[in-house]
Amino acid sequence: MSATALRIVEGSSMDKSKALAAALSQIERQFGKGSVMKLGKNDRSMDVEAVSSGSLGLDIALGIGGLPKGRVVEIYGPESSGKTTLALHTVAEAQKKGGICAFIDAEHALDPVYARKLGVNIDELLISQPDTGEQALEICDTLVRSGAVDVLVVDSVAALVPKAELEGEMGDALPGLQARLMSQALRKLTASINKSHTMVIFINQIRMKIGVMYGSPETTTGGNALKFYASVRLDIRRIGAIKERDEVVGNTTRVKVVKNKLAPPFKQVEFDIMYGEGVSKMGEILDLGVKAGIVEKSGAWFSYDSQRLGQGRENSKAFLKANPDITAKIETAIRQNSGLIAEQILAGTPERDADGEEPADE
């Protein structure tokens, strides 16, 4: 028996290339040309196109210059931490490049005035406010399959209410219903997301697990499927307030790249989100410039190329805003050196994710 099997293997090894060619020919006849190909010949799969997140520091931390197209992205964090702001900045950046964007507002809470202030062209933004989770994900699937949408935002997973839950009564126990809905939707979506080159951003909320003795009790809604299907997961937190005299005018925000299939993960970056403005580009350029050694800081004074920018961070930000030429020079210098100094300026440590576990290597 073993001798016969050995002879079969020996015989087939002589004509492996012919056997492979016959198999590939059969697959292409059955499933169409391009069903199987050599990876190196598919140029599109080699280079992942990215859309800027609206934050210079986060673009560097992500390793590819922004959020990836043709992939699933999850942004999660506590309430009022900047999740929707970050998603809207990405939409604005995609629109600047001529992209078509859609926003599925399951929370029914999108503020068009704020979106416009962030740079979103609301006249061209497609918006849907679905009644049920099934309707939201069906709309998402149809838009992705069209191949015409560049960025699609779902805000939020927690607000995707299954139809059975809506039709039931308050207090009905329906365990795992939303998780099953998300799992089924993502199984259908992933292939068409990759083919259509659409970036789908899922915004998610945080919940607390009861009875957790060790590790973080935090978890995200919608089950585990999204954690597996997402190529990038961002944990966004508000870590401080920005004040002008006694008035709070913004938040200091920290974003951790909890998962990244396209570059080394676990980087983290901090930036300012100003009320009514969004991510403070001037604040980021100032902070990254100091960390990279491009902007000099002496006491409270900031200077660039022997020219003083201002005393104090807020004054320096105002100077940069009033002098776009200097701002552009500093930004160019940061981007040119980002590859060499990314590890120094954005060094992060392995952080526990929203389930209190260190994410495994992909």
From Swiss-Prot:
Listed PANTHER family: MITOCHONDRIAL DNA REPAIR PROTEIN RECA HOMOLOG-RELATED, RECA
KW Manganese (keyword) present: no
Role: Can catalyze the hydrolysis of ATP in the presence of single-stranded DNA, the ATP-dependent uptake of single-stranded DNA by duplex DNA, and the ATP-dependent hybridization of homologous single-stranded DNAs. It interacts with LexA causing its activation and leading to its autocatalytic cleavage.
Recorded GO CC terms: cytoplasm
Record organism: Bradyrhizobium diazoefficiens (strain JCM 10833 / BCRC 13528 / IAM 13628 / NBRC 14792 / USDA 110)
Protein's recorded name: Protein RecA
Major subcellular site: cytoplasm
Keyword check for DNA repair: yes
List of residues binding ATP: G77, P78, E79, S80, S81, G82, K83, T84
Family: Belongs to the RecA family.
UniProt subcellular location: Cytoplasm
Matching InterPro entries: AAA+_ATPase, DNA_recomb/repair_RecA, DNA_recomb/repair_RecA_CS, P-loop_NTPase, RecA-like_C, RecA-like_N, RecA_ATP-bd, RecA_C_sf
GO molecular function: ATP binding; ATP hydrolysis activity; ATP-dependent DNA damage sensor activity; damaged DNA binding; single-stranded DNA binding
Entries under SUPFAM superfamilies matching the protein: P-loop containing nucleoside triphosphate hydrolases, RecA protein, C-terminal domain
GO biological process terms, semicolon-separated: DNA recombination; DNA repair; SOS response
Keywords: ATP-binding, Cytoplasm, DNA damage, DNA recombination, DNA repair, DNA-binding, Nucleotide-binding, SOS response
